Structure formats: C-alpha cells, structure tokens
A protein has these predicted regions:
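ATP-dependent adenylation/pyrophosphate-handling site
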Residues: 2-47
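Alpha-helical scaffolding within the catalytic cores
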Residues: 18-20, 53-57
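Metal-dependent de-N-acetylase/amidase catalytic core
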Residues: 1-4, 27, 43-50, 61-62, ...
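A generic signature of intrinsically disordered, low-complexity regions enriched in glycine/proline
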Residues: 15-16, 31-33, 58-59, 117, ...
C-alpha cells in the first residue's frame, strides 16, 4: 500500500498520523508526506527555518517516510493563495506518489491553513477523473490533529467523528511521541493536547 499524508505545516503529519505512519512504514508500506507550508513565521517560539527543516527531516526519517513534498505557501495566510495553486501542488504530489490512500486535515479544524489544505485536497483527489493515466485513489481519510480538531467551534460544519482506526499498539504511540519530540517547541506539559500523556490517552480511546 502507498499512503500520502497531506498537511498544512511541519509537525501536523506527526501529530495527526505519526503512529500509523510508523506502523505502515515498518510493515513495508510506502509513506509520503506533502507539506504545504514549510515555514513557521507565525509561531510564538519559532525555530529558524533551517532548524525547522532539520526537525522535519529527522522526525519523518525516524517514522520511515519515503519522501517529503515541500511547498512554500505562506504560513497562516494560505487563504490569500488562489485555490487552484493549492490544488495543483497537491495534484503534482499525487501524480508522483501514486497513493492508494490520502489522509489530510478535517475541514472543521480551527486552524484556517488546515481548512484550506483540506478543501484543496478534496478537489485534488479527483484528478484521476480528468486524467485517466493518473492512478485512482482508493480511500480518502481525515485525521485528528491535537489542539486543532477537538475544539469543534464551527457548528456550521460537521465536527470530526472518526469511523476508521488503525491499531498501532504501545510501540506505535511511543514512536509518535518520540518523533514529535524531534520537533523543537511542539510538545507541552499535560493537560495540553500536545503533551505525551494526552496523546497516549487519545490513542487509547
């Protein structure tokens, strides 16, 4: 199986699907990641760009990621980018990666970049209908990103209600937490949603 994780920012892939990515890669499946914005200028305690790139590469290598597609769209300003450009960037990743399964943000996430990524991804997965030579995507999943998905503020959108789970075991959860710790400034003390205890508890639900 081939998986493509499409996310707005570095660390979103690990927060949302890190344990599953680790399991799939170690089972011999191919896991690619598409990151729309590889900078973090809007973060309060941001690392330097080269530090963030290093963290992204180290974390994803540990998880067993095959390839990272890196976009340069503006951080927390993706709503200023023409929708078509976002779609075309994801389409290019789909054409090269040839995934069976694509996973991205839920559109009701509180982060607007997550919304823009999700909406663009929804359109990009239809590429095979227009381009018969492009491999058909078999499944399309949303994932939960702690501290963004669980807020459920926008009642106009259906909130995240998972109906598909991947059994990753303690080893997978531990791998996710270790991969997250490779990103500077991401982890927080409990009860923050990006704490080791919270992530462990979420995986047990």
């Amino acid at each position: 199986m081939k998986y493509l994780i499409v996310v707005a920012h570095p660390d979103d892939e690990t927060l949302g699907a890190g344990a599953s990515m680790w399991k799939w890669a170690h089972n011999g499946d191919t896991v690619d990641v598409c990151i729309m914005c590889t900078e973090a200028k809007a973060r309060a305690f941001r690392p330097e760009d080269n530090e963030l790139e290093d963290d992204t590469n180290v974390s994803n290598k540990f998880l067993g990621v095959n390839k990272i597609y890196e976009g340069t769209f503006p951080n927390i300003e993706m709503n200023t980018v023409p929708h078509l450009k976002l779609v075309q960037f994801i389409e290019a990743a789909i054409k090269e990666s040839e995934p069976d399964v694509i996973i991205t943000h839920h559109p009701a996430d509180t982060n607007n970049d997550h919304l823009q990524t999700s909406m663009a991804c929804q359109e990009a997965i239809r590429l095979f209908q227009r381009r018969p030579e492009v491999k058909r995507v078999k499944e399309f999943w949303y994932m939960e990103v702690p501290s963004c998905t669980e807020w459920k503020i926008n009642n106009a959108m259906e909130s995240f209600n998972p109906n598909c789970y991947v059994e990753v075991g303690k080893e997978g959860v531990d791998a996710k937490i270790k991969a997250l710790s490779m990103y500077r400034g991401v982890m927080r003390p409990y009860p923050h949603p990006r704490s080791a205890d919270y992530i462990t508890g979420l995986a047990a639900m």
